[in-house]
Design a protein with these regions (language model features):
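Active-site acidic short loop of glycosyltransferases
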Residues: 32-34, 64, 90, 111
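Structural microenvironment flanking redox-active thiols in thiol-disulfide oxidoreductases
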Residues: 50-88, 100-107
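N-proximal helix/coil linker or "cap" segments that precede and/or mark the start of modular domains
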Residues: 1-24, 29-31, 60, 79, ...
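Conserved redox-active cysteine motifs that mediate thiol-disulfide chemistry
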Residues: 32-57
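Short beta-strand segments
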Residues: 39, 69-73, 95
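Thiol/disulfide oxidoreductase modules built on the thioredoxin-like
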Residues: 90, 97-143
Length: 146
């Protein structure tokens, strides 16, 4: 219950650190002054993969607008993640965290399943369970926060 209380709209978004494609750590601090649409996914997750075309279309629709797309892979196999990013030509900020080494990530976001989409603005939670890219409601939510 304490976790759910912490993740309500308007609360501070819990910080994270994850790796980029070059293995360089990227901290949430460097992104927190923006509107972020965050996607937590993995290469082995079929519903996650199914969202890729819709995610690409969503990113295209918001090109040049003040929204930053951040995808965080929770794959066990870092190379599988890197290969998928290349193969699918994924854009936006692509990050990786190994859940077995990063239990905090699961606990901080009450991550019981993926894909998980979150919308965060200026460090505050808008939605910890935002609509998927394939859901038309996602544009309403993003537009209301631009």
């Amino acid at each position: 219950i304490a976790v759910l209380e912490r993740l309500k709209p308007g609360k501070d978004f819990p910080p994270f650190t994850a790796e980029d494609l070059n293995g360089k750590p990227v901290s949430y601090e460097s992104l927190k002054d923006k509107l972020l649409y965050i996607d937590v996914w993995a290469t082995w997750c079929k519903p996650c993969i199914k969202e890729i075309p819709s995610m690409k279309a969503l990113q295209e629709a918001y090109k040049g607008k003040p929204v930053t797309f951040v995808s965080i892979s929770v794959d066990q196999d870092k190379e599988a993640w890197k290969a998928a990013v290349q193969r699918e030509k994924l854009s936006g900020i692509q990050l990786y965290t190994n859940l077995s080494m990063n239990r905090d990530f699961i606990d901080n976001y009450d991550l019981s399943g993926i894909p998980r989409f979150m919308l965060v603005k200026n460090g505050k939670i808008i939605s910890i369970s935002a609509p998927r890219p394939s859901d038309a409601k996602v544009k309403e939510l993003i537009n209301a926060n631009l």
